Structures are given as C-alpha cells and as structure tokens.
Curated annotation (Swiss-Prot):
It comes from Shigella boydii serotype 18 (strain CDC 3083-94 / BS512). Catalyzes the stereoinversion of LL-2,6-diaminopimelate (L,L-DAP) to meso-diaminopimelate (meso-DAP), a precursor of L-lysine and an essential component of the bacterial peptidoglycan. It holds the Pfam family DAP_epimerase. This is Diaminopimelate epimerase. It comes from the Bacteria. Keywords: Amino-acid biosynthesis, Cytoplasm, Isomerase, Lysine biosynthesis. The active site is at 73 (proton donor), 217 (proton acceptor). Homodimer. Pathway: Amino-acid biosynthesis; L-lysine biosynthesis via DAP pathway; DL-2,6-diaminopimelate from LL-2,6-diaminopimelate: step 1/1. GO terms for molecular function: diaminopimelate epimerase activity. It catalyses: (2S,6S)-2,6-diaminopimelate = meso-2,6-diaminopimelate. The gene is dapF. The record marks 159, 208 as: Could be important to modulate the pK values of the two catalytic cysteine residues. One of its GO terms (cellular component) is cytosol. It is found in: Cytoplasm.
C-alpha cells in the first residue's frame, strides 16, 4: 500500500489514496500503523475515497491513532487538500468534499496555504454532545477535585475550551485526560487550554480525543476562537499560536461559517506491506 506522511503544524498524518487503491483499515491495523516505534507513526490516518455525490470531488475519512473514527479534523482537511493536488487526483483550487460530519469547501491559496470553510459552530449541548439542561456561554464542571469554568462547542466534533493565565504552565497532561472522558461528554471531547494575549491573538494547547496532546489541532483552534467570540473575549479575526505554529481563524458570529487558514506540509511518500 502506498501512503504519504504529511503534517499541519506538527499534527501528523498518514494519508492514503483509496481512490486508486483498494484498502481496508481495522482498528487493530490502525493502532499498529500509528505506533511510532513499530509502525509509521501518526496522530491521525486520513483515507481519501471517491465521492458519494456527483456534485462533490471526494469523500474522506479520519481515524485517530487509537483506531476510532472521527467526523472532523481541521489540520487533516488542509493536508487532504494538498495531497489530492500533489497526487494529481484533482487540479482544482476549490475542492468540495464530504466527511462523516457533512460537506466542506477547501481552497488552496496562491501562497499554498489552505483555507477551510469549517461551517457554523454549534453551541447546543445536544450537538456537542454535552450533558446540560440548557445552552450557556460558560459551564461549571467538577473534575480532578477542581471547579472548572469552560465553554463547549461542536465544530463537527466535540470541544471543551478552558481559559488559562499561561498555557506553558496549564495542567494539560493531568486535566486533559480527565476532562476528555468526563461523564458530561458521552462521546468524549477535545480539551483546549486557551490563553488570551489580546483580542486578536491567543495561545492554545489541545488535548485531543483519542490522541493526547498534539502539536496543533485545527478544529481546536476554531473551537477556542468560537468560544472566545461567544464570550466577548475575542475579535472576528484571530491569530492562534499553537506549539506547532500559527493558524488564522475568522468568524463573523452566529449565522456565518467559520474559516481556518494555515499550512499543510508533505514530508515523504512510502510503501508498506500489510
């Protein structure tokens, strides 16, 4: 099986063309391939498939390193767009795709950045899903013997965002896994730790569902900005500084889609016997 290794700000992917290859990935095989000592090593596996709708260009599936399938991955979307152009599967700059979450339009810019229409953030608890009696801008949670204030939102996948004074000293490794599997998140959640530098700039670390802390999380950056705007902390255009680099997020508020712009890097091509 041929594959490519790619990354978006250090969030790394094994990308497989299932348009021209017949492939099947069991959870066990994905876990083996994801192992950084015994396999290829990656945060997520991206599988490119033919479209199910003639109006679309592709369908793609996203699997975490633990073998679980997820509906959305912002960094993966950008790598997907670069991959299909690099491999000659399309020469379009505006690429229409479907995922388990719905449809997206990805735009490759003249400077080889990728702009992704991530859709409108959904703050309804049932959409996240999150156990709450009603939608609030801020929720109070108990975890690890602490009282935590957070915002929750769906960006096609579940996110919890906590504001911290300094991301460098935030309890990502201890609080992240506790909140990820908290009983109020029946499908688990991605946990973002956000430091507001100013209204147009935040720093962010994300403990990803099924992957742990990663160098960058595109949907996590979108979630942090959406929650920050909802809570009146941020402007409509925000620079997000992650351990792996920078993303630019823009959202005009309710009734409008959120846009993410950032890089996608092709590292190498490989071949593996399954």
């Amino acid at each position: 099986m041929q594959f490519s290794k790619m990354h978006g700000l250090g969030n790394d992917f094994m990308v497989v063309d299932a348009v021209t290859q017949n492939v099947f990935f069991s959870p066990e095989l994905i876990r083996r391939l994801a192992d950084r000592h015994l396999g290829v090593g990656f945060d997520q596996l991206l599988v490119i498939e033919p479209p199910y709708d003639p109006e679309l260009d592709f369908h793609y599936r996203i699997f975490n390193a633990d073998g679980s399938e997820v509906a959305q991955c912002g960094n993966g979307a950008r790598c997907f767009a670069r991959f299909v152009r690099l491999k000659g599967l399309t020469n379009k700059r505006d690429i229409r795709v479907s995922t388990a979450n719905g449809r997206m339009v990805l735009t490759v810019t003249d400077d080889d950045l990728v702009r992704v229409n991530m859709g409108e953030p959904n703050f309804e608890p049932s959409a996240v899903p999150f156990r709450a009696n009603k939608a609030e801008k801020t929720y109070i949670m108990r975890a690890a013997e602490q009282t935590i204030l957070c915002g929750v939102v769906s960006i096609g996948n579940p996110h919890c965002v906590i504001q911290v004074d300094d991301v460098d000293t935030a309890a990502v490794e201890t609080l992240g896994p506790v909140l990820e599997s908290h009983e109020r998140f029946p499908e688990r959640a991605n946990i973002g730790f956000m430091q507001v530098v100013k209204r147009e700039h935040i720093r962010l670390r994300v403990y990803e569902r099924g992957a742990g802390e990663t160098q960058a999380c595109g949907s996590g950056a979108c979630a942090a900005v959406a929650v920050g705007i909802q809570q009146g902390l941020l402007a409509e255009e925000v620079r997000v500084e992650l351990p792996g680099g920078r993303l630019d997020i823009a959202w005009k508020g309710p009734g409008h889609p959120l846009y993410m712009t950032g890089p996608a890097v092709h590292v190498y091509d490989g071949f593996i016997h399954l």
